């Protein structure tokens, strides 16, 4: 079972900010604090006092791990270990400790003039609270206005910015999430922010982000001037602008403007221009829904407010505190609207096949991969000389080794787009089996040296391996998958290999075609490089023809490293993929809240 953990990059950022912020404030900046304005001086000393408590407490001394094998001691980064201990903390201790870490980062950001990435602040806060067994109740308590006093130095909540954020989320609920995805969802259950919207303001410090907007804008602003000098926010989903409207009106306070619920902007008091540049919505392929939202502001340097959503909850589990992955995702087909965000290129797929039936023969080709639509097993003698027949077979394509079968009942065979059989055999009748004794590659003829014929062709430069599926392989047979543009072939013992070569030579001398595979107890691993046109049809056929249980079993062997990389998550290396029970709706997440539903 996959276990997500907080990004190590973000952990390093926070750890560096806490430690360097402390030493900078302790050694180099105390004297300079006297030159600050009175309010800044008070804020700085507040930061420094909290930071001293953090560094002089658990943050200063990392845990030491003793390796029993070589009797060595290794210092361990303490932040992740400390976060795990939060599960045992009381509510007040957790809130105060979190405030201390935030204050440490504020010192680092203010003194060094290097802003800590704000989406990492949101990430860390969400990660910490997700470790609690109390779940949502602690989250709401942490984010409530009554607890805002513990955020010393972060400042009071900007109500106008809070209102802006709430209206922004309302637009996403009504337009982007419901219309763009077109799903029949219970909005209260499926679209749940993991925190109160005021957390966004507190975690990012509205004064720092919004360039000093604290007071009401004068009510004498002209509507035409506002419309001319301001640009409304665009809501962008999957590289397409969903909402863009420059016609908006001034609200009662003159700060937040909306025309018909589709345009949202925040006006700078001095420049009278909109501060929000873009609002991006990102698709999450794991949950098949909205992943996170990024609000880009027109500040110098540009700042981004990120709102990360948890995974979707099942309707009947809406009132629980457990994170849940939707069980029904693997039963869905692929449709055109479900593009992986960031255009993840899937160009290679491997799948496993069961033990083949007795070999059958090809009625059309004398070289290559033979498939037949009948149950007969007769030797077919070619009517043409071997050289002429080989020329006709390979004259239209080069390097085609992509005769593969994707359905469990072997009813459909797909070919490379340059293969002459590409269109003819897209929908064959029932096929007893798929056999591929030889390489279907140009130049692999009877006159070639047999040792050379067993080598794979040159890898095409435009074909890359991105995502793979690793099927189960029996231990008694070693299966080797040849790189991209080749079929995988099975290496058994040396005796079997020599026997196969002798049989191949005898077949070429007699100009008979006898296709077959050795009867071995193995699941054949077939590798194929898929073009973009073939991928859609391949996955559609595979999903529609496979039962949910088989899909779950197939998914247990998948490597989602590329997906985790796109989602800025890391896979716990100590955990391996384990079988998933279909009866367990929360996929093994009921025992602990360490599994985070973040994207």
Swiss-Prot record:
Name it: Protein ORF A
Q: Determine the domain of life of the protein's source.
A: Viruses
């Amino acid at each position: 079972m996959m276990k997500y953990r907080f990004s190590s990059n973000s952990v390093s950022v926070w750890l560096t900010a806490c430690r360097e912020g402390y030493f900078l404030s302790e050694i180099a900046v105390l004297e300079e604090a006297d030159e600050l304005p009175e309010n800044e001086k008070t804020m700085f000393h507040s930061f420094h006092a909290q930071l001293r408590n953090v560094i002089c407490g658990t943050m200063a001394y990392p845990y030491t791990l003793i390796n029993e094998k070589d009797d060595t001691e290794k210092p361990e980064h303490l932040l992740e270990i400390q976060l795990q201990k939060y599960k045992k903390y009381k509510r007040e201790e957790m809130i105060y400790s979190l405030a201390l870490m935030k204050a440490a980062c504020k010192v680092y950001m203010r003194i060094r003039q290097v802003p800590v990435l704000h989406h990492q602040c949101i990430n860390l806060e969400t990660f910490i609270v997700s470790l609690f067994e109390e779940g949502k109740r602690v989250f709401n308590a942490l984010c409530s206005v009554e607890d805002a006093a513990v955020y010393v130095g972060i400042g009071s909540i900007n109500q106008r910015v809070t209102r802006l954020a709430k209206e922004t989320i309302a637009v996403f609920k009504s337009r982007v999430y419901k219309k763009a995805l077109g799903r029949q969802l219970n909005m209260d259950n499926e679209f749940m922010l993991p925190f109160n919207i005021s957390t966004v303001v507190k975690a990012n410090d509205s004064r720092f982000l919004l360039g000093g907007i604290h007071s009401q804008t004068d009510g004498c602003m002209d509507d035409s001037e506002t419309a001319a000098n301001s640009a409304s926010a665009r809501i962008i989903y999957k590289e397409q602008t969903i909402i863009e409207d420059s016609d908006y009106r001034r609200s009662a306070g003159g700060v937040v403007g909306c025309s018909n619920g589709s345009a949202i902007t925040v006006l700078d008091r001095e420049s009278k221009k909109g501060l929000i540049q873009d609002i991006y919505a990102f698709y999450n392929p794991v949950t098949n829904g909205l992943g996170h939202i990024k609000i880009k502001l027109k500040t110098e340097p540009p700042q981004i407010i990120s709102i990360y959503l948890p995974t979707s909850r099942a309707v009947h589990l809406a009132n629980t505190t457990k994170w849940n992955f939707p069980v029904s995702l693997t039963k869905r087909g692929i449709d055109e609207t479900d593009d992986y965000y960031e255009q993840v290129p899937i160009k290679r797929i491997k799948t496993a096949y069961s033990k083949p039936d007795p070999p059958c023969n090809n009625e059309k080709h004398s070289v290559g991969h033979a498939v037949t639509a009948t149950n007969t097993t007769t030797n077919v003698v070619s009517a043409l000389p071997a050289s002429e027949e080989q020329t006709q077979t390979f004259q239209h394509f080069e390097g085609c080794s992509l005769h593969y079968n994707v359905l469990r009942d072997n009813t459909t065979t797909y070919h490379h787009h340059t293969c002459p059989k590409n269109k003819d055999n897209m929908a064959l009748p029932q096929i007893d089996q798929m056999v591929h004794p030889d390489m279907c590659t140009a130049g692999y003829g009877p006159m070639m040296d047999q040792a050379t014929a067993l080598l794979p062709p040159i890898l095409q430069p435009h074909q890359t391996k991105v995502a793979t599926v690793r099927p189960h392989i029996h231990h008694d047979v070693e299966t080797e998958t040849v790189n991209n543009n080749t079929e995988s072939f099975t290496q058994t013992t040396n005796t079997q290999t020599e026997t196969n070569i002798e049989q191949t030579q005898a077949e070429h001398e007699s100009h008979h075609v006898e296709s077959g595979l050795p009867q071995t107890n193995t699941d054949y691993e077939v590798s194929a490089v898929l073009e973009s046109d073939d991928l859609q049809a391949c996955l559609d056929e595979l999903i529609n023809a496979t039962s949910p249980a088989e899909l779950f079993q197939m998914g247990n062997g998948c490597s989602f490293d590329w997906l985790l990389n796109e989602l800025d998550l890391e896979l716990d290396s100590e955990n391996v993929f384990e079988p998933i029970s279909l009866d367990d709706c929360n996929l093994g997440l009921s025992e602990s809240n360490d599994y985070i539903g973040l994207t």
